[in-house]
């Protein structure tokens, strides 16, 4: 079989064409059955994968989301996933409990959350020791800007960031202790890890694309299994000019893993102690689930399906 004929078979195996095996057989002018061609194509793909590195993990990604500091989980549960290529933090690092619309019997100051969240991220990054850290924001992180918008004049708003993550990752911040008359500076993570060899990146958006996988933390929510992820898939198909093969959804505090068409849909669960978060008490909502996602990609950023998974912690 000629090289161009093999490429046609590989395109069918890799779902890059809608032609069926009968059409491909006729186009190639082969005198074999479509089933024989399909079986031969399996061997062609296995050999091509071996030669060109397909299905060989080039990039391993550990994605956690919904830490909701101070309700975060102990990062030592991630022991098996040390030294991954990328630690991806998919939003809602801090809870912004004091700024929420939910009724509360006590308040946790945003400054306390920022200080604790920053230290937790430092300890987490040192423990995992990834090559890169990529973080986007979530709906709880954006509460920061929403609170300022409701309570400050627009001129003052220009002095404020959108989320506390900008301060934690890029700008640093100061805590002015009015009681003790002290001022403490907290350096940003880009400075903390400047000489470590770990690349730190904060993406000022609710979504980030790594390879052909989207990691998203939208404001929208649907209660059905993978319904929010499916809605995100539809949005991304309308807006992403390039192809993608996976959507990893934060925000829902649910776990799920399925395919729709050629797109893998994952809901990764929450990396926080959901039993300590009392927002849903008495609302008869479905139980929250704790978990995280492992995403593996080949050298071209394509998803390696059999090595990508959701890890459920409860």
How should these model regions be labeled?
Residues 2-5, 22-43:
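Short, basic interhelical loop/turn and adjoining N-cap
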Residues 219-303:
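Conserved beta-sheet core of the metallophosphoesterase superfamily
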Residues 2-19:
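Short, amphipathic alpha-helical "recognition" segments used to contact nucleic acids or chromatin
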Residues 63-65, 86-92, 134-139, 215-218, ...:
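Active-site neighborhood of phospho(di)ester-bond hydrolases with catalytic His/Asp-centered motifs
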Residues 299-314:
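A short C-terminal boundary segment appended to hydrolase-like catalytic domains
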Residues 151-231, 270:
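Active-site-proximal loop/helix segment associated with metal-binding centers of metalloenzymes
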Residues 45-57:
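Short Lys/Arg-enriched helix C-cap and helix-to-coil transition segments
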Residues 64, 69-182, 186, 190:
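Core catalytic region of metal-dependent phosphoesterases/phosphodiesterases
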């Amino acid at each position: 079989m000629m090289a161009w004929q093999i490429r046609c078979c590989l395109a069918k195996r890799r779902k890059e064409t809608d032609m069926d095996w009968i059409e491909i057989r006729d186009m190639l002018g082969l005198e074999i059955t479509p089933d024989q061609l399909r079986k031969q194509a399996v061997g062609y793909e296995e050999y091509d994968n071996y030669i060109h590195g397909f299905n060989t993990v080039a990039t391993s990604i550990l994605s956690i989301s919904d830490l909701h500091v101070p309700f975060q989980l102990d990062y030592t549960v991630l022991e098996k996933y040390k030294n991954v290529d990328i630690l991806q933090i998919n939003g809602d690092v801090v809870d912004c409990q004091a700024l929420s619309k939910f009724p509360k019997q006590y308040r946790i100051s945003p400054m306390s959350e920022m200080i604790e969240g920053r230290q937790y991220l430092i300890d987490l990054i040192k423990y995992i020791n990834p090559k890169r850290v990529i973080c986007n924001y979530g709906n709880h992180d954006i509460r920061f800007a929403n609170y300022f918008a409701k309570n400050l004049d627009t001129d003052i708003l220009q002095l404020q960031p959108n989320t506390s993550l900008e301060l934690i990752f890029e700008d640093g911040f100061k805590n002015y202790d009015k009681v003790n008359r002290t001022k403490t500076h907290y350096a940003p993570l880009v400075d903390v890890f400047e000489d470590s060899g770990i690349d730190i990146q904060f993406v000022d958006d609710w979504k980030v694309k790594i390879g052909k996988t989207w990691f998203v933390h939208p404001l929208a929510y649907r209660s059905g299994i993978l319904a929010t992820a499916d809605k995100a898939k539809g949005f991304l198909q309308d807006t992403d000019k390039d192809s993608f093969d996976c959507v990893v959804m934060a925000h829902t505090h649910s776990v799920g893993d399925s395919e729709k068409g050629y797109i893998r849909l994952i809901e990764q669960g929450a990396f926080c102690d959901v039993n300590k978060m009392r927002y849903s008490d008495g609302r008869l909502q479905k139980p929250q689930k704790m978990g995280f996602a492992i995403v593996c990609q080949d050298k071209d950023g394509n998803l390696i399906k059999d090595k990508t998974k959701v890890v459920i912690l409860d």
